[in-house]
Curated annotation (Swiss-Prot):
Catalytic activity of the protein: (1S,2R)-1-C-(indol-3-yl)glycerol 3-phosphate + L-serine = D-glyceraldehyde 3-phosphate + L-tryptophan + H2O
CC per GO annotation: cytoplasm
Signal sequence interval, chain numbering: none
EC numbers on record: 4.2.1.20
Role according to the record: The beta subunit is responsible for the synthesis of L-tryptophan from indole and L-serine.
Keywords of this entry: Amino-acid biosynthesis, Aromatic amino acid biosynthesis, Lyase, Pyridoxal phosphate, Tryptophan biosynthesis
Protein's recorded name: Tryptophan synthase beta chain
The keyword Lyase is assigned to this record: yes
Subunit description: Tetramer of two alpha and two beta chains.
Length: 404
């Protein structure tokens, strides 16, 4: 007899890939057989102890997990309120959380007999992580990257090339992440037989949002255990930056059924009223993009608007569908931080903790800096420090008027 499904937020999506009214699979007819094949392969892999053992092996011995939980003592004193802990996923191999998902997906590609890897990238971190695992398993790799992002992320472009990947600049649209994803989907339609598309965020058609979340959920599982060891209890607040939303859902998933306040921080760019931001939950409305229904930045005619953020990893005009669902039911609070606030937080982290964060988690830190002073000293904030800032030093220098 089947056990009843517990009343849990962690059981979604449903069998159609839906999180409430969000998610699903809106893809070209030529892709549907492949999507169904991918779903079947993933469901089988998830239930295969050998696959999960192999995944854990690479996370431990190649990625370097578990990543540490760090009490940011000097930052805590400077802010003068709640204790601030960092989940330090920037210490992973390749410098961000992206590698967790790439390991899982390339093991699935290998299991399915696929011989060619494609990916999209914005900041370049997912591109680097995909090129890394493709090199590890000896598979050819093509990374689609908006021409605008190629210009502002030169170090990561060179890293991808060193790792043997071909980087294809995309010049359509605003030449950023949305456009790179469009090109990758076109490639996949044209090469369905031998190609595996490693999507970097918790978006795209089902099963990608659930699959990426599951591979990233190691972040929250580890952080939960580490928090219990360090403090004997769960945090009061867990905070993460939101672009497509994979690092955030990876952290949040372990806490969805707990009394932990969850906060996602979108990129407010030059301000929510400026029209130059990437805050699709704050300023968007539901629509369909890249195979799923979710909140999107769009005009009155339903045309997708260009997103802006100082952080190349956050300037996506949509959000993973699970975040849209969690927003609508009120389980997660979604706020935003501007370019200037993220820059200030970036510098604060460097100065107080000796850690150069990526501009993506600097948005989360900007919100930590807002709320921590108003909380008592026994309160605990857990923040996902999901990437290191080496890739961003040229951008930061330019904004600070420095020449490198």
């Amino acid at each position: 007899m089947n056990k009843p499904i517990p009343n849990s937020l962690r059981t979604l999506p449903d069998d159609r890939g839906r999180f409430g009214e969000f998610g699903g699979r809106f893809v070209a007819e030529t892709l549907m057989p492949l999507i169904l094949e991918l779903e079947a392969a993933y469901e089988a892999a998830k239930d295969d102890p050998d696959f999960m053992r192999e995944f854990q092996y690479y996370l431990q011995h190649y990625v370097g997990r578990p990543s540490p939980l760090w009490f940011a003592e000097r930052l805590t004193k400077e802010l003068g309120g709640a204790k601030v802990y960092f989940k330090r996923d920037e210490l992973n191999h390749t410098g961000a959380h992206k590698i967790n998902n790439c390991i899982g997906q390339i093991l699935l590609a290998k299991r399915m007999g696929k011989t060619r890897i494609i990916a999209e990238t914005g900041a370049g971190q997912h591109g680097v992580a995909t090129a890394t695992v493709a090199a590890l398993f000896g598979l050819p790799c093509i990374v689609y990257m908006g021409a605008t992002d190629v210009e502002r992320q030169q170090p990561n472009v060179f890293r991808m090339k060193l790792l043997g990947a071909e980087v294809r600049p995309v010049t359509s649209g605003a030449s950023t992440l949305k456009d790179a994803m469009n090109e990758a989907l076109r490639d996949w339609v044209a090469n369905v037989r031998d190609t595996f598309y490693i999507i970097g965020t918790a978006a795209g058609p089902h099963p990608y949002p659930a699959m990426v979340r599951d591979f990233q959920s190691v972040i929250g599982v580890e952080a939960r255990a580490q928090m219990m060891e360090a403090e004997g209890r769960l945090p009061d607040v867990a905070i993460a930056a939101i672009g497509g939303g994979s690092n955030a859902i990876g952290l949040f998933h372990a806490f969805l059924d707990e009394q932990v306040k969850l906060i996602g921080v979108e990129a407010a760019g030059r301000g929510l009223d400026s029209g130059e931001h990437a805050a699709s939950l704050s300023r968007g409305r539901p629509g369909v993009l890249h195979g799923n229904r979710t909140y999107l930045l769009q005009d009155d005619d339903g045309q997708i608007l260009e997103a802006h953020s100082i952080s190349a990893g956050l300037d996506y005009p949509g959000i993973g569908p699970e975040h849209s669902y969690l927003h609508d039911i009120g389980r997660v609070e979604y706020v935003s931080a501007t370019d200037d606030e993220a820059l200030a937080a970036f510098q604060l982290c460097c100065r107080t903790e000796g850690i150069i964060p990526a501009l993506e988690p600097s948005h989360a830190l900007a919100h930590v800096a807002k709320i921590a002073p108003g909380m008592d000293k026994e309160s605990i904030i857990l923040m996902n420090l999901c990437g290191r800032g080496d890739k961003d030093i040229f951008t930061v220098a330019r904004h600070l008027g420095e020449q490198i």
